[in-house]
Amino acid sequence: MSIRTSIALIGILFAISIYTVLLVVYVSTLSQNGSGCIYATLVDSSLYDAKNFTWEQYNSTLIYTALGNKLPLDGGFDDFSDVCRTYLVNLTSISGLASHVSTKPKIRSVVGTRNCVTYLWRIHIQSLSSSLGLYTIFYVIREWRRMFGVVRFEDDAISTARYTKNYAARVISSVLLNTTYTKMSRFMCEIMIYKNALSRTFKDDPISFLFHHPIAAVLIITEGLVRLGAQCLCLATLSMYFVPCEKVLSKWFLSITGIFIGIIICIELSLLLAPGPVDGAAMLGETKQVKKDECALETSPSGVHVFCSNCCASLISNILIKVLYILFMIILIVTIVRYERTLQIALFGRAYLP
């Protein structure tokens, strides 16, 4: 069950990443071709009515003019509609052509504009990026709960011996200090025994357990809310089919969007409806056999040298992990901000960020 869930979550992360990249490429193509603008137009300006306009994609064979020489309404969200207004022609400059029989059907009076490149960026690309981040956070929180928190099924638990700091301390003590460091392993074993006891209580009566352990309840609820937020942001892509900007999307891209949404829904439903593991029947007073190697520890020699080496292994591993984590976060944040700014300038000519 746990392995299948982890594989499913990794599959969701992979699907969101691939679709987001495809959407960015498609939006870049729209921006370069100048086909990312749509207009709320009236064929006959004398029949002006806010309910009678129709949205249509920019067409270079048509003539677009502002109704009454007034700037049309934009689409909101600070959507750079000034880019779309550059295609508008002053009505007075074509007054002679407007009365011509062959030209009049090509004139469109514009009452509103919308830059769909900005809409797709602000609404969908950023929502998918947030969904990807929330799914990643959920995956990390879930793995930590499986290692240090309570779980309902034994198959969902992860041995605390796999804790990164425990492994780092063991490697440093073995490779650099030529000694055997078991203090962290013993501590992880004690945590695992305590965690297993809490998990049995949680499995027998989850509601009472969460009532008596409010911190665990808050953490589990937070984990669920993070996943729910990721699902909502991801499925918000469905709105792409019901907005005027749907006109700038090709049929093949709409098909890819439908396939992507279908994959996410199928994976989430499979995780929701998948049955849990069946516990074997046990006789009264019978206890399950514990794995012999679960808390097996090597005996380490004693002495001042070994004590100093163990302290060094613990300190060095702690500092090393924190330094690597800080460097990773700095590089990740700088890369994301710089890439987003560069991409916004390429798409819109300017960026939201200063």
Curated annotation (Swiss-Prot):
The keyword Nucleotide-binding does not apply. GO terms for cellular component: host cell endosome membrane; host cell Golgi membrane; host cell plasma membrane; membrane. Residues 1-31 form the signal peptide. Glycans are attached at N33, N52, N59, N90. It comes from Gallid herpesvirus 2 (strain Chicken/Md5/ATCC VR-987) (GaHV-2). One of its GO terms (biological process) is symbiont-mediated induction of syncytium formation. Belongs to the alphaherpesvirinae glycoprotein K family. Residues 142-171, 227-252, 337-354 are cytoplasmic. It is a multi-pass membrane protein. This is Envelope glycoprotein K. The keyword Cytoplasm does not apply. Interacts (via UL20 interaction region) with protein UL20 homolog (via N-terminus); this interaction probably plays a role in the coordinate transport of protein UL20 homolog and gK to the trans-Golgi network (TGN), and is required for the cell surface expression of gK. The lineage of its organism: Viruses, Duplodnaviria, Heunggongvirae, Peploviricota, Herviviricetes. Its main location: host cell.
